[in-house]
Amino acid sequence: MVNLVVVSHSALLAQGVAELAQQMTQGGCQLAVAAGVDDLDHPIGTDAIKVMEAIESVYTPSGVLVLMDLGSALLSAETALELLDPDMAQHVQLCAAPLVEGTLAAVVAAS
């Protein structure tokens, strides 16, 4: 089964998308969140290490689909792919779909 990673600049946004997706599919696939940065004064942003760890947490040879909200989230996801073991990275796809709609469509298709 393909699993998903939601990458967002906002932890609250990503958690909300993940919660909605999991409610719609009742846990049909695993979904991880990589969102926000560890800065209490400026929590908005993305972190390539968080993205890499999220991918590793739901990895399956069947694949991992990564959905992102804004431009620099794509850069973080691309960096995360470079940090992954190449054997693992070949099973990871980055998806340019709108974050909410794309995540919902992907979890329904994967479930």
Annotate each PLM feature.
Residues M1-S111:
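N-terminal loops that bind phosphate or other acidic moieties
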